Amino acid sequence: MDGRTRMQIDFAHQPPSRVGIEWELACVDRGSGELAGVAPEILRSFPHDDAHPHVTGEFLTNTVEVVSAPHSRVGHAVDDLARLIERVVDVADPLGIDLMCAGTHPFSAWPDQDVTPDNERYATLLDRTRWWGRQMMIWGVHVHVGIDDASKALPILNALLVHLPRFQALSASSPFWSGQETGYASNRALMFQQLPTAGLPPDLTTWADYERLVGDMTHVGVIDHHSELRWDIRPAPKWGTLETRVFDGVSTLGEIASLAALVQCLVHDMSAALDRGEELPRMQPWFVRENKWRAARYGMDAIIIQDAAGDEALVGDDTRALVERLSPTADALGCEAELRGILDIVDRGASYQRQLRVAEENDGALAPVVTHLVEELRSGLGR
């Protein structure tokens, strides 16, 4: 890959396969179900520092994000999230605020939402992206998994792109936008990729390719820092991880645990394969693009491209086989129960399917969908 500038980017030391999770949560008014811009008020109860785990704000004032510490076990990271959310709920309850999570809100309108003030990063993003950036009324889950050497980052990233449609379909939770059913399982996926540095990563092979890309993009003014590359899967050099960001926001701790376990097992297996001198699978970029669109459009009904040869399968059938293959790895990592929760999603339906059922049962009314999402989150906390 040619480039005019190569920027050296140090990759932090992180014990391999350690996992950390970020969960974006929407604040909604208990009476109306509308989004409520109360995150700044809630966050005053959580003094900011750089310690983990922590609670923080996001792009919009209707959003609170909880972040786990890195752990070797998925279950311990999820325990962090549960403790943090319990604290957030204790602050939000007296304000008449509930928490929910989905890729999008079923009916609130984006022009009614406020951008978090006094944040230079958000102001710069908004100044550059304008109308599209202003519409980013979306929520997601980010899963970090540690890798022990920067040279593994791009091969593992490319291999994870083979699995991206599974991640997208299993987490899909955004069938509605501004009160309308979109016909997409994940409308968030299509919204987020409108930002110029979001969506699928470019076709890179080595860490040097990545450094040259960052150098070139900095040189021509696309970004000021590599953290502004908001790809669906990206290296996170500061933490020594690969960060899978394609997931729609999901409403239960159990689903988050299952998705995190799936990524952890895959990265662990891929890293071990590289240690054995094996080449990891990858697919043509247009196959990856097509898979993302199919999963965003059809969710668990998507027929996905499985490999570079163009073999296809229904995503649910393909995922069942993958879970069985990863079972020994999950057992070794202590996340077998969490991984098998993926099969529960396949059997009972992803969040978008459950939301659509609730809307249908209520003659198309969407307020009950918000109630359903709030109740799913609370039930996972035992409330």
Curated annotation (Swiss-Prot):
Pfam families: GCS2. It catalyses: L-cysteine + L-glutamate + ATP = gamma-L-glutamyl-L-cysteine + ADP + phosphate + H(+). Gene3D superfamilies: 3.30.590.20. InterPro entries: GCL_type2/YbdK_subfam, GCS2, Gln_synth/guanido_kin_cat_dom, YbdK. Transmembrane segments: none annotated. GO terms for biological process: modified amino acid biosynthetic process. Its EC number is 6.3.2.2. Keywords: ATP-binding, Ligase, Nucleotide-binding. It comes from the Bacteria. GO terms for molecular function: ATP binding; glutamate-cysteine ligase activity. The keyword Nucleotide-binding applies. The keyword Metal-binding does not apply. NCBIfam families: gshA_cyan_rel, PRK13517.1-2, PRK13517.1-3, PRK13517.1-4. ATP-dependent carboxylate-amine ligase which exhibits weak glutamate--cysteine ligase activity. PANTHER family: GLUTAMATE--CYSTEINE LIGASE 2-RELATED. Belongs to the glutamate--cysteine ligase type 2 family. YbdK subfamily. This is Putative glutamate--cysteine ligase 2. It comes from Clavibacter michiganensis subsp. michiganensis (strain NCPPB 382). The lineage of its organism: Bacteria, Bacillati, Actinomycetota, Actinomycetes, Micrococcales.
